[in-house]
């Protein structure tokens, strides 16, 4: 249904379903060739969920203003992969097991993927002088009823 498209959930798990979906979208009216996304905006920047699938997880992006830190949480099962596509970032990590800490600095010139691992609290800080834009993949869709995101000092 087009309502699933608006919820940004995709289910293309095999070649038959892929072909069926491709056929379905060829019948969409022109008015449904595009749709708006919801932007969650505050003084830190914006966060936008782009694609969701129970099979491949979720793709989102965020922006952060200079000096802003986002995150400061951990997950039990959620894996995340971050790619800075504009700006400079510092990722901080703290092990929940032994309090070990470390940092990773990266920027858009490196094209380096930084992963958050379950059991490690993490945050990301814009250490540059301009807006930072980060592409984010998570292995599971955010579920407001079971968020698997727990605030924790890094």
Predicted regions span which residues?
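A short beta-loop-beta micro-motif enriched in histidine and acidic residues
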Residues: 56, 68-81, 108-110
């Amino acid at each position: 249904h087009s309502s699933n498209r608006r919820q940004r959930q995709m289910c293309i798990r095999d070649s038959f379903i892929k072909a069926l979906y491709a056929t379905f979208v060829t019948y969409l009216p022109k008015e449904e060739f595009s749709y708006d996304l919801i932007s969650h905006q505050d003084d830190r920047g914006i966060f936008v969920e782009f694609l969701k699938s129970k099979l491949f997880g979720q793709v989102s992006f965020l922006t952060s203003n200079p000096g802003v830190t986002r995150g400061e949480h951990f997950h039990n099962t959620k894996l995340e992969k971050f790619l800075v596509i504009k700006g400079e970032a510092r990722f901080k990590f703290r092990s929940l097991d032994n309090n070990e800490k470390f940092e990773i600095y990266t920027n858009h010139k490196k094209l380096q993927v930084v992963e958050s691992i379950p059991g490690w609290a993490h945050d990301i800080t814009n250490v540059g002088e301009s807006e930072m834009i980060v592409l984010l993949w998570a292995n599971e869709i955010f579920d407001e009823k079971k968020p698997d995101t727990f605030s924790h000092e890094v």
